[in-house]
Amino acid sequence: MGCSVLLLTITVSTLGGLVFGYELGIISGALPQLQTHFSLGCVQQEAVVSALLIGSLFASIIGGWLIDRHGRRTSILLSNLLILAGSVILTTGTSFFALVIGRAVIGFAMTVSSMSCCIFVSEMVTPERRGLMVTLYEVGITVGILIAYAVNYIFNNVPLTGWRYMFGFAIIPSLIQLASIVLLPKQAEVFVIHDDDSRQADRLTEETETSNQHQQSEKYGVSDLFKSKDNMRRRTVIGVGLVLSQQFTGQPNVLFYASTILFSVGFQSNASAILASVGFGIVKVIATLLAMLCSDRAGRRSLLIGGCSMLAVGLILTGFLCRQSVIDTTKRCTSVGPHSNLTLSAEHDEGVGFSSQTLDVHEHLRSFSQSEDIYKWIIFTCLMAVVSAFSVSFGPMTWVVLSEIFPKDIRGRAFSFINCFNVGANLIVSFSFLSIIDVIGLSGVFLMYGVVGIAGVVFIYLVLPETKGKSLQDIDRELSQTRMIHRQELCSIFQRRRFSPGYQRVQLTSTAT
């Protein structure tokens, strides 16, 4: 019984991640067609992209209450039905307003599903498997993104209706997930999957009893997230800091505007830009699988620090390379045609303005075409490194940590509260991306993201404890009793250096003989 419930749980969670990733990635290829079909301007394009996040923000506000009140399974079921409804609205939509409504409905459903699946799986498995199983959700997301990019490429050349097929394809995995949810027992949340080893089973039983006693004697409200009680304020700081670092390193824009970014750095057709974005999807899948295998070995903290460091380096290199390349342009959004504002060919140079170049475009492109081609592939390689670093670190590990650091009876509401910051930051980053490029150029945007990545490394080192191999009760107990250990260690190092005796000049005197 336990194994069958576990398999169904994994199936539901992974399919939820797949649909989540698909909806994140599909807009990248659909946006150029939507821009042409509906004559969308810059703000309208950003609105279609960000409508997903507006729905997600609303879900973050009420989703925690929904999960804690009605259970994880019911929440997943509701989100699945809403995704089906949103997909139908998008597939049959005939106006800009319908696109925004459909994307908002799907955004609400995706967020409820994301929170429910991560919490559900974390409560179902043993500590030794928790990192692996929760990371499976992120694997589903990356596979969904890869499928979305592939579908974008397939339907890119379908005139007029290609974007409808792109949005409608999400119905297939949603129906499969719906069937899996129906088969999942209603009381699956009360099952705990035991290891074959009897001592492990006994330990889990004891921890379950301890957890029940703890819930009876200790109840939390949302206001407790801001109090020093059981170090809840510290846990909230950890969660908020992780999601803000995750979003302000610009990863959402690499997903939402992948084709736009690749087009702007030299992939001079929609098809080539979309095909190159498939490479992002492949790298994300491979890197996430690596994180899944290493999360319970290397640990959450190590993967976050290492991945975020690599992320920062990749972003800064991309920024400098864009600045050196003649491709570093400021954008002027138009609704003439897909990516017409980014075209670098000599035939369409009238709409392109260079942020720091005043040379004639025709002569410049003829003189440096080979150099541009080299820059294009180096930048593409750096972006691949950025995508893989994110997929090893922030992508899966943020949600693993968030599912572990809060007590069970407030976990849903805490997850929801933290996700409000996650979605809010995502909304700011995504909605302002094209406008910021107009002001500081593509290189400035990536350099800014790189600085945030460096700050993220420092934050993780100072405040995040390692949680690998620990039960949820052990993590709760440790966080309730300890402060920011790594910050104290760092301060002690500086204090030792400050008060330790420095070098002293020794004067040697010679005595006359």
From Swiss-Prot:
It is found in: Endomembrane system; Cytoplasm, Perinuclear region. Its main location: membrane. The chain crosses the membrane at residues 7-27, 47-67, 81-101, 105-125, 131-151, 165-185, 237-257, 273-293, 302-322, 377-397, 423-443, 444-464. It is a multi-pass membrane protein. One of its GO terms (molecular function) is D-glucose transmembrane transporter activity. InterPro entries: MFS_dom, MFS_sugar_transport-like, MFS_Sugar_Transporter, MFS_trans_sf, Sugar/inositol_transpt, Sugar_transporter_CS. Residues 1-6, 68-80, 126-130, 186-236, 294-301, 398-422, 465-513 are cytoplasmic. PROSITE patterns: MFS, SUGAR_TRANSPORT_1. Disruption phenotype: Morpholino knockdown of the protein causes notochord and cardiovascular abnormalities. Fishes display a reduced heart rate and blood flow, coupled with an incomplete and irregular vascular patterning. It catalyses: D-glucose(out) = D-glucose(in). Keywords: Cytoplasm, Glycoprotein, Membrane, Sugar transport, Transmembrane, Transmembrane helix, Transport. One of its GO terms (biological process) is circulatory system development. D-glucose binds at residues 246-247, 399. Coiled coil: none annotated. Residues 28-46, 102-104, 152-164, 258-272, 323-376 are extracellular. GO terms for cellular component: endomembrane system; membrane; perinuclear region of cytoplasm. The keyword Glycoprotein applies. The keyword Calcium does not apply. It comes from the Eukaryota. Glycans are attached at residues 270, 341. Belongs to the major facilitator superfamily. Sugar transporter (TC 2.A.1.1) family. Glucose transporter subfamily. Facilitative glucose transporter required for the development of the cardiovascular system. This is Solute carrier family 2, facilitated glucose transporter member 10. It comes from Danio rerio (Zebrafish).
